[in-house]
Amino acid sequence: MSPQPQPTQPVRLARAADLQTSGGQTDGMLRQNALTDLCDGICASRMIAKPHSSSAVHHHGAQDTIVLALSGHGTVVSEGGHKRVDLKPGDFCLIPAWAEHQEVNDGDEDVVWGIMRSGRAPEVVNLTGWGGDVAGEGQ
């Protein structure tokens, strides 16, 4: 019988109470890295959207993103602003790599989402609008 592979690092914990603002930000959202720069294939963060706020239009480069709605009722807008996917607590949503989108909180309470991405650390590329240039470039 061949030996079982050994883990490359110990089990890690990121307590919710210890998360601080970090990583890529977009206007209207608070992003807090939870488990980043620990392994090449995945990272995790928390996103908090205050009531009546929305992010800039953005994408996450080559990273696929899975959203788990933890609290509040939020929306992912995509396809040039024409498609809306509403998330309530317990719902999952896949945002494919390079997909332009916007997070929206039209409600009266915070929206909190757990975010898992297919990379070592979250990548956030803010745009000037749907189909727009990378924000801040050439300005």
Language model regions located:
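Short strand-connecting beta-turns/loops that link adjacent beta-strands
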Residues: D40, A62, G81, D108-E109
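Double-stranded beta-helix
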Residues: S2-Q4, Q102-Q139
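A short, N-terminal "cap"/entry segment at the start of jelly-roll beta-barrel domains
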Residues: M1-I42, A56-V57, T128-Q139
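Conserved hydrophobic/aromatic beta-strand scaffold that supports enzyme active sites
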Residues: A44-I48, I66, R84, F92-L94, ...
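A short beta-strand-loop-beta hairpin characteristic of the jelly-roll/cupin
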Residues: S54, H60-P89, A99
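A short, sequence-level motif marking secondary-structure junctions
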Residues: A17-Q20, A62, G90-F92
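Short, well-structured hydrophobic secondary-structure segments
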Residues: M47-S55
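Conserved metal-binding segment of the jelly-roll/cupin
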Residues: S78-G80, L87-G107, M116-S118
